[in-house]
Amino acid sequence: MSDSHLTAFDKASKAGFIIALGIVYGDIGTSPLYTMQSLVENQGGVNQVSESFILGSISLIIWTLTLITTIKYVLIALKADNHHEGGIFSLFTLVRKMSPWLIVPAMIGGATLLSDGALTPAVTVTSAIEGLKAVPGLSHIYQNQTNVIITTLVILIVLFGIQRFGTGFIGKIFGPVMFIWFSFLGVSGFFNMLGHLEIFKAINPYYALHLLFSPENHRGIFILGSIFLATTGAEALYSDLGHVGRGNIYVSWPFVKMCIVLSYCGQAAWILANKHSGIELNPFFASVPSQLRVYLVSLATLAAIIASQALISGSFTLVSEAMRLKIFPLFRVTYPGANLGQLYIPVINWILFAVTSCTVLAFRTSAHMEAAYGLAITITMLMTTILLKYYLIKKGTRPILAHLVMAFFALVEFIFFLASAIKFMHGGYAVVILALAIVFVMFIWHAGTRIVFKYVKSLNLNDYKEQIKQLRDDVCFDLYQTNVVYLSNRMQDHMIDRSILYSILDKRPKRAQVYWFVNVQVTDEPYTAKYKVDMMGTDYMVRVNLYLGFRMPQTVPRYLRTIVQDLMESGRLPKQEQEYTITPGRDVGDFRFVLIEERVSNARQLSNFERFIMQTKASIKHVTASPMRWFGLQYSEVTLEVVPLILSDILKLPIKELVPVEDSEA
């Protein structure tokens, strides 16, 4: 990796600063919309809070942002980049060779991040629209919560509906809008604080610890469930590392943290000034002059949409990485934008829309959604902590120090998890069920792949070179295709799946000029595109190992065209001149791709558990993208052959021949 690349990644710029605001901080930047509201409502309303409660709450928020977001994610996790990419799956690829069981926290963390994130659009957009209740002239309309729900659903329908067309055209305004948003948070919070400068005392962690054990705190330790709402977007700082670079996050985070802390302090000051007024509005909107509220609601809605868009795009990236790591079913992926980073997965898009819409309809108010929000993300953070410990050890940190540092963060996050566990009975169960469903699918997919690797028998290609050469030269068989390509998941040295050789020689002898055996391997580097060729001492058998990064599309025909051209130019592969063609000088023949689908056979080597895994995986495959689409073969000639899962040492089933008995009287 060149020094120039490292410098660009670690360097900050004005443009990068603005871009980071629009991509990275949508979730954590919209938390002021609902965090203080949740704290006040759970305490019994504005008239039930005291100065010590407010100071303690603000202190808890400040130190939660400092410990989890600043120290863990900004100062530690951002250094764990995988060739400039971040996120839990990127972190997993860095440490997966250290222990096979690390796939478990990676799957759990990915599933909980995906499931809890499905609530973000519902919470943020609903909170923003509820701000219309504080707008003179519109309050009488939006006091009816049904109108809030309808408006929220319309926004969500439009937001999810435009994903298929790409969002690059609106992405350009994300940064400037979020800059205005954060500036407003900071300025309004600062002016609200001027009359209550005692809020600055909240910097002292004493107030945070005192509140946890104070009788004034009606919820005890469970207050941390609401406090955690302030930092739910911390994981995004790490996940979006590759989009904006480490340097831009280092520079932009202090600005963002200052603005959101000022917003929380400003809301706290307004609460102290109005705790006897009986006002029951969201402190975020109520703390702003009434004549500015309509503009604030508009700005808050834009910020909520940007936060939701960041979540949706992040979900697509997360699922795409899981598919390439072979721990998630293959779904159709399209690229509506101008670059590979703008991808779209239709199935995931509409599942997210369904979950988000059902959340709005089921919970109705943002307050009820907040009661369920944040539970699963605490698990994601715990899983990231586990993987980070292994990363620190891998990078040379003394094991005892790595254990101590990560044990501290694990303890803090586990306390937040316990505090959020009460949310399970208030709607958190929906998020947990969704997370468990995703983990189940991941487990089935991963376990099914391991079972196939365990039982499928491989043969040495060298033992069949002569047979394949004889078939190639045997004019008794019609030419099946000039080039026949087999895609194999399992190809090591000269060993290859027996089903492939069975297809060439036994099922129907396939005569061709060149036989291609292609294996696609996903590398730890996100944007690798390399290949290795072994001609096996022939000019008619080609073994190709494609090494593609876990963020690269696996469009095999495009890569194969380049490889064929390279081999012909180097003289390793004879030119395949065409007698009939509309392309003058064409020297590459036609290609046919043969895909082999393995299905569960009735052989008795499979245990009941293994059979359940394989049958469940087969059922899931019915709703996933076909290998033809996944490998970019839609416009190629493709043959699909179905074979039973070939097992080693197949057991013979006993059977006897019935012999006719001669008539005794004959």
UniProtKB/Swiss-Prot annotation:
Transmembrane portions of the chain: 16-36, 58-78, 100-120, 149-169, 173-193, 221-241, 253-273, 294-314, 343-363, 373-393, 399-419, 424-444
Q: Write down the membrane topology.
A: Multi-pass membrane protein
Annotated S-S bridges: none
Q: Does the keyword Metal-binding apply?
A: no
Compartments, as annotated in UniProt: Cell membrane
Molecular function GO terms recorded: potassium ion transmembrane transporter activity; symporter activity
Reaction catalysed by this enzyme: K(+)(in) + H(+)(in) = K(+)(out) + H(+)(out)
Instruction: State the source organism's domain of life.
Output: Bacteria
Q: Which InterPro entries match?
A: K+_transporter, K_trans_C, K_trans_N, Kup
- Pfam family of this protein, just one? K_trans_C
| Record carries keyword Ligase | no
Cellular component GO terms, alphabetically? plasma membrane
What keywords would UniProt list here?
Cell membrane, Ion transport, Membrane, Potassium, Potassium transport, Symport, Transmembrane, Transmembrane helix, Transport
Q: What is its main location?
A: membrane
**Chain's role:** Transport of potassium into the cell. Likely operates as a K(+):H(+) symporter.
Q: Show the PANTHER family listed in the entry.
A: K+ POTASSIUM TRANSPORTER, OSMOTIC STRESS POTASSIUM TRANSPORTER
Regarding protein family, the annotation reads:
Belongs to the HAK/KUP transporter (TC 2.A.72) family.
Task: Indicate what this protein is called per its UniProt record.
Answer: Probable potassium transport system protein Kup
Q: What taxonomic classification does the UniProt entry list for its organism?
A: Bacteria, Bacillati, Bacillota, Bacilli, Lactobacillales
Chain's gene name: kup
